C-alpha cells in the first residue's frame, strides 16, 4: 500500500500532516499481524504532482495493491495517467482519496469526507465564544469522517503464477 502526499503548506499542515501520520500509524500497527508492505511517496505541490506520483509508482519494484492519496485532486489525475499504462482500477489496484471533490463522483472515486459546514459552524462557535471572553468547554474535538464507497476499490486477490497462467485464490 502506498500513501501519496505533498509537503504541506504552512496554512494546511495540521490536516495534511495528520492524514499522513494517521496512515503511518495504521500501517505500523497492522505490520505486526499482517505481511504488510507500505510506503509514503511525497510529490511536489506544483502542477507536476500527478506526473511525479506516476513516475514514482512505476519505478517501484512491485506495483502496489492499494493507493491512498492525500486528496482527491491527486487521486483523480493519477487514475487517468495510470490507465495509459494499462493499470486499471479496481482490476489492478484500489485507490482512495480525501475530501469528496466535485469530480470524485464523476470518476467513481472512493473517498473520505468530513462535513465542511459542520466544521465551519463549530469553528465559528469557538471563535465567537473566545471573542466574548468565555472559556471553551471543549477546545479540541474529533470530527468524524464518512467513507463514500464507489468503484475504485476492491478486495486484494492473491495471484499465483504457474506456467504463465494466473490462479486467483
Model-predicted segments: where are they?
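Bacterial carbohydrate/catabolite-sensing allosteric modules
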Residues: 1-169
Amino acid at each position: 500500500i502506498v500513501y501519496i502526499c505533498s509537503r504541506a503548506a504552512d496554512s494546511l499542515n495540521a490536516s495534511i500532516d495528520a492524514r499522513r501520520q494517521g496512515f503511518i500509524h495504521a500501517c505500523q500497527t497492522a505490520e505486526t499481524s499482517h505481511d504488510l508492505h507500505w510506503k509514503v511517496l511525497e510529490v511536489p505541490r506544483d502542477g507536476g504532482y500527478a506526473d511525479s506520483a506516476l513516475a514514482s509508482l512505476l519505478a517501484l519494484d512491485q506495483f502496489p495493491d492499494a493507493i491512498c492519496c492525500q486528496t482527491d485532486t491527486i487521486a483523480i489525475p493519477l487514475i487517468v495517467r495510470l490507465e495509459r499504462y494499462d493499470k486499471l482500477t479496481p482490476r489492478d489496484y484500489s485507490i482512495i482519496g480525501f475530501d469528496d471533490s466535485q469530480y470524485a463522483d464523476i470518476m467513481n472515486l472512493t473517498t473520505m469526507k468530513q462535513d465542511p459546514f459542520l466544521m465551519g459552524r463549530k469553528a465559528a462557535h469557538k471563535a465567537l465564544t473566545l471573542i466574548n471572553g468565555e472559556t471553551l468547554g471543549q477546545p479540541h474535538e474529533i470530527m468524524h469522517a464518512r467513507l463514500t464507497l464507489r468503484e475504485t476499490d476492491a478486495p486484494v486477490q492473491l495471484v499465483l503464477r504457474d506456467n504463465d497462467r494466473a490462479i486467483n485464490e
